[in-house]
Each structure stands twice: as C-alpha cells, then as structure tokens.
C-alpha cells in the first residue's frame, strides 16, 4: 500500500506538470465592483437589491481579509414604500450567518483596545440594521459563509401577517467557472431555424426518447456514461434551485485548479469546485458542470449539462449526465493518469438529485422517459474510464417554474409506466 501511494503521488505530479504546461497559467477576473453587479426585485411597494462581494472587494470594504476566515459579505438594500415595517431575516440568507460583533472579534484578538474598538465600530456601522419602517430605505451588509463562483441569495422580509421572499442567483467575481468560458447563458448556441419549441407533451416526450443514449469521447468513437437527465428551465428557476440545494459550479481546468486537485487528492481535503473531465454531446464538451461535494475530494455528486436546440413552451431544455464519485484511482484512460471512480448504481445519483429538487419549491413536474436502456447488475456497461455501471435505463425529466410549488403539489407524469409510477422502489432484487 505504501509503494502504491508513493507511485500514485508521483504519477499525479507528473501528470500535473505535463498538463499545466498546456493550460492557462492565470484566468481573467471579472470587474470587481459590487455596486455595478446589483440585482433588484420589486413586489407591491417593496424594492430589494443585493450584490455578493468577492474576496478582494470584502478586503477593500472591511480592511481585513474576511475570506481567510470563510466570511463573505452580501450587500442588501431594502426600500419600503408599503404601509408597514418589515424585518430582514438573516438566517434565510444563511442559517449560519456571522453577527457583525462575532466577525469583528475574530480579527481583533491581536489588536490593542483602541484598534479593537475601531474595528468593532466599523463592522457595526457596515451591518444591515433592522427594522425597515414605511417610507425608508435601509442598506448594509450581512456576513455569510464563503461561496465562490455563484451564490444563491434568498431574502425574507417579515411583518405582522405578511411575508415577502426575493431570490437572486448572484455571480461572484474572481472565479472562472466553466460556464463562463462558454458563455452558455449569453451566447446563442443555435440559429433560429435550429430551435424547436414543443407545446405538445407527446411530441416532446418522443423527442426526449430519441436523444442520444450516451456521452462520448471527443471523436465520438466510444460511448461513456448514460445521458440520464433532462432539465427544463433556466436562470429564473432551475439553476437557482440547483444552487440553493448545494450544487456548485466547477472551475475551469487551469494551472491553479490542477494544483488544487493535486493537493486535495494527496491530503484528501474537500475541493467544492474541483474541475470535471470533458465529455461530449452535440459535438462539444459539456456547457456547464455542477457538483455537490462531500468532505473530501474523492466523493461528490456531479452532473454535466448541454443546452439542446429544444424548447418546451419557450423554456430551455438541458440534457445531462449525473453520477456519484466514490473514490479515485490510477488509469491510462485519462490524460491526468488518475480518475474518479463512479458508484455503479447511477440511478441512485439521479434519484438523489430529484429528491433534492423536490425541496427547492421550484420543481413543478417530474417524469421518466426511455433512455439508455436497462443494464442489470450482473451485466453492467462501462464508461470511458472502464468503470462499470448498472441502471434501469430511464431518464429523469424535471420541469421547473419560478412560482413556488410545494412537494404535495408536484405533478408526477405517467410518461413511462413503472410499477407504482415514478415513485418505484429501487430494490436490489429488481436489478
């Protein structure tokens, strides 16, 4: 085991030095001016604005490196033209938010009494202060736990007998996510003639069943993981739901992210934004990838998504692949000479995602359609790195909507007839 560990570490370093020679040594950062990134929502006389600060911006505003202690300020402004006072609920933004006094104390331990008092006064002055009386505009910062790339900002304003909820998906500068590189949300991937907008459910179902079964390698000469996921929605519903339930963007592969991968692989530490390898559909690698990491780099749920030329009642249709990493190993089938090992039960990762999304309140409908076809446990298929997997062979289809939907009101479409409908127990005997 010791010899294998030494070999593995040596191989990782060789792969890293080989690979980083071909990668960008730095990545472009977005303009770091949080006031230029303000997002605003309005509802019945109440206007709410928000912006999430980068590491450098928080240093400039507070004068201390908040990010080093895992703290991230969110700037909030509430203009109340209603007839009643509101209270901003900080736990709605982050259940583990940092009160200003606690955060100031973390940076004042080595300061003298005068400097400590100045720091405490500054943190208190910058903090958002409740309540928000009628006819007033209140602004300030709430100190949250650090996120890179993107942050889901949910703001709950309460009053006697009233609740107003505002949600933002806010980009955080200083982090190069893969979807930034492709500009998947801003660029027109398909011509007007290529886009097909489905309004008939049966036609849409047939189109989903006729999608390719697998991702492939770059040359499309070998099949990989099953395409087992379809998401209908966009920046107003599907992606806020994914982020809110813990999925995070993956970093592009560059020298810095490769080195983080190396150190995390050796130490076993968590890397919430670790890059994923490229897989191919529609002649291109994934448009974006998201992952939900555990406490170490070897274990994570990750999904890759491609924007298709289909629309459903005008909404974007994303085709994807989801699986769960349960370890890592050496391989000759990856340019890095190491790869994550997937859980062979790929349906479990899909089921976990659908269950997560049910709690998002943005999931409106859910269905199964025919996909890759069944691969039983005793006759599994293999992905591109030769990991075996087994599956019932269906695709999970999730329809999102900006309007809240409780779990009890989610519609289960009977597109694919399974015993008990879509809520079918995945027992080992059935495999």
Question: Residue locations for each model-derived region?
Answer:
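C-terminal motif of bacterial Sec signal peptides marking the signal peptidase cleavage site
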Residues: 18-21
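Bacterial signal peptide processing site
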Residues: 23-25
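Low-complexity, acidic Ser/Thr/Pro/Gly-rich terminal tails and inter-domain linkers that flank the onset
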Residues: 29-68, 208
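Surface-exposed edge beta-strand/loop patches
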Residues: 35, 126-192
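Short, solvent-exposed beta-strand/turn "edge" segments of beta-rich domains on protein surfaces
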Residues: 58-75, 81-85, 131-133, 219-220
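The feature marks short-to-medium sequence segments in extracytoplasmic or secretory-pathway proteins
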Residues: 81-132
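Short, hydrophobic/aromatic beta-strand segments
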Residues: 84-92, 153-154, 239-244
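A cross-kingdom signal targeting lumenal/periplasmic-facing segments of multi-pass membrane
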Residues: 255-429
